[in-house]
């Protein structure tokens, strides 16, 4: 009897420890899911302890944890719970680690909560592996998929917002540094080199390149870099103008060496260079010597108007035989040829 009383007290202590552990688990689950009345009702059922147990024979019907009324789901299902049999009759202590715990699980799908008897997990056996229903696994998969979709959507929205902020920070128009004609440069356009800018400045269509805004330097360059760039461009521009003037002067001098095109060549050279050409003293000496040997120009012939002056006179060789015969017969001394080609005979006064 002493051993049986010890075994009964041991079982009571063990039952109380199991109840306290279940209460801790239920406190954790109730913090995540509100209104878990079903789980608390199961714990109340577990707390029911028989008033007196005089003996633990196999002949007397035993009231174990599995035989307690299960009012959690409205029906009693003793077949779903394993029976815990005492081993005090066999003469050895009971199993100190009985693996029996009933946890009612609530599955979250987004904002809705699904609960039911099929969602309950029962941990049975020494390994303690859970037996999860297929509906519970499908719900967990859908919940994970939903969370991943929400995370991806939030990440995309953050990227869009960052891109919009970057675009707003960029300036609307950037001005390319140029001391004579500042021009607009598009955001996606590559910077123009100095050689390309000079080629476009000397020849080409410059419409639409002059900006209407006041001139300003780019913010990317420092003060020292800006000064150096302006000095270099100004010196190179002056050098290019000097080379161009020198070439035009050489062309003008070559044109002036030809006597027939001297005057025309000088005019062309002056027109091209837009400034007076100053030839050297040697060229001036040669030009004066050539002018002395230049032949005088012939007077320009006037145009003959037939309506006013008539047909021009054609001079032919006089036929003396015909004239002598006319003088003999008519006795005229002189023949006057008019402009019309008619011949008139003039008689002498004494004849």
Curated annotation (Swiss-Prot):
Q: Identify the domain of life.
A: Eukaryota
Q: Does the keyword Nucleus apply?
A: yes
Q: Where is this region: Disordered?
A: 69-101, 117-144, 275-298
From start to end residue, where is composition biased (Basic residues)?
73-83
User: Which body tissues produce this protein?
Assistant: Specific to testis, where it is expressed in spermatogonia.
Composition bias, Basic and acidic residues: 275-285
Name the record gives this protein = Protein Tex24
**Species per Swiss-Prot/TrEMBL record:** Mus musculus (Mouse)
Ranked from the top, the taxonomy reads: Eukaryota, Metazoa, Chordata, Craniata, Vertebrata
**Gene it is expressed from:** Tex24
């Amino acid at each position: 009897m002493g051993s049986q009383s010890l075994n009964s007290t041991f079982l009571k202590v063990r039952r109380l420890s199991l109840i306290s552990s279940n209460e801790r688990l239920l406190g954790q689950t109730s913090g995540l899911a509100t209104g878990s009345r079903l789980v608390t009702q199961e714990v109340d059922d577990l707390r029911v302890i028989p008033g007196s147990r005089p003996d633990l024979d196999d002949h007397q019907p035993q009231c174990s944890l599995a035989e307690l009324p299960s009012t959690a789901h409205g029906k009693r299902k003793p077949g779903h719970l394993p029976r815990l049999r005492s081993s005090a009759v066999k003469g050895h202590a009971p199993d100190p680690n009985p693996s029996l715990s009933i946890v009612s699980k609530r599955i979250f799908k987004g904002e809705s909560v699904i609960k039911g008897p099929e969602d309950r997990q029962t941990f049975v056996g020494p390994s303690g592996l859970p037996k999860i229903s297929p509906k519970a696994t499908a719900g967990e998969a859908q919940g994970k998929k939903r969370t991943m979709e929400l995370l991806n959507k939030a990440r995309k929205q953050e990227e869009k917002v960052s891109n919009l902020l970057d675009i707003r920070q960029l300036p609307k128009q950037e001005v390319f540094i140029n001391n004579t004609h500042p021009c607009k440069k598009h955001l996606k356009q590559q910077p123009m080199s100095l050689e390309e800018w000079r080629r476009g400045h000397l020849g080409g269509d410059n419409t639409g390149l002059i900006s209407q805004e006041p001139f300003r330097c780019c913010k990317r360059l420092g003060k020292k870099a800006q000064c150096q760039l302006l000095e270099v461009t100004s010196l190179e521009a002056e050098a290019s103008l000097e080379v161009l003037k020198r070439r035009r002067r050489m062309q003008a001098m070559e044109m002036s060496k030809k006597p027939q095109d001297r005057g025309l060549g000088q005019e062309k050279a002056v027109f091209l260079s837009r400034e007076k050409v100053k030839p050297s003293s040697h060229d001036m000496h040669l030009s004066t010597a050539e002018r002395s040997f230049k032949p005088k120009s012939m007077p320009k012939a006037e145009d003959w108007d037939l309506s006013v002056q008539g047909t021009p006179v054609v001079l032919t060789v006089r036929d003396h035989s015909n004239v002598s015969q006319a003088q003999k017969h008519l006795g005229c001394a002189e023949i006057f040829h008019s402009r019309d080609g008619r011949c008139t005979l003039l008689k002498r006064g004494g004849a």
